[in-house]
Amino acid sequence: MIGKLSGRVDSSYDDYVIIDVSGVGYRVFASAKTLSKLSEGESYKLFIETHVREDHINLYGFLSLEEKSFFNLLQSVNGIGTRMALSILSALTPTDIQIAINNEDKNIFKAISGVGAKLAERIVRELSDKVAKISSSSAAIKDSLNIKGITPVASSEVIKALINMGFSRFEAQNAVQEIITKNPEISIDELIRTALKNRNSNF
């Protein structure tokens, strides 16, 4: 089995790239997020998940072991295969997925093409216990909310305030994490103002 490929992107297509490794071209399927980071002519290291079937051998590539882990985790849900797993990872990062599952936010998944209400419910239900077992950024999220005086209690209040101002819980948590990571010494008032400013600039 192939576990990793290091080579140059020879050509790219809608859902895969050809990786040239010492003159041999490997077709590697990947999420849209990963494909957007791969430039033709540049060299990369991709972690590979190999799927062997009677009629084909497919390689799936990831820039991080975390994304690869979530690719496999998603396929443990009844009704999700490799294509759907990549579609979900094309729309959401592993951190996004973990936050959505922890918050039982089915709407995040329902917004993805091909994911209906029943499948979204299964994702949240079937992965609620499993998602905590994967080494992801949950610890980083917790730490980022507990540095330089921004305590978990304070960050929770900020998140509640943002929700009252029209944010979804998912948006509020992501906004708080991103801002504190960039500016650990930010005050609570400035944190709220920055979150609102960033949100308005995205519309």
UniProtKB/Swiss-Prot annotation:
Compartments where located: Cytoplasm
Region Domain II, annotated ranges: 64-142
Pfam families: HHH_5, RuvA_C, RuvA_N
UniProt xrefs under InterPro entries: DNA_helicase_Holl-junc_RuvA_I, Hlx-hairpin-Hlx_DNA-bd_motif, NA-bd_OB-fold, RuvA, RuvA_2-like, RuvA_C, RuvA_C_sf
Major place of residence: cytoplasm
Molecular function as annotated in GO: ATP binding; four-way junction DNA binding; four-way junction helicase activity
Ranges where the record places region Domain I: 1-63
Family: Belongs to the RuvA family.
Role according to the record: The RuvA-RuvB-RuvC complex processes Holliday junction (HJ) DNA during genetic recombination and DNA repair, while the RuvA-RuvB complex plays an important role in the rescue of blocked DNA replication forks via replication fork reversal (RFR). RuvA specifically binds to HJ cruciform DNA, conferring on it an open structure. The RuvB hexamer acts as an ATP-dependent pump, pulling dsDNA into and through the RuvAB complex. HJ branch migration allows RuvC to scan DNA until it finds its consensus sequence, where it cleaves and resolves the cruciform DNA.
HAMAP family assigned: DNA_HJ_migration_RuvA (MF_00031)
Entry domain remark: Has three domains with a flexible linker between the domains II and III and assumes an 'L' shape. Domain III is highly mobile and contacts RuvB.
Protein name: Holliday junction branch migration complex subunit RuvA
Lineage start: Bacteria, Pseudomonadati, Pseudomonadota, Alphaproteobacteria, Rickettsiales
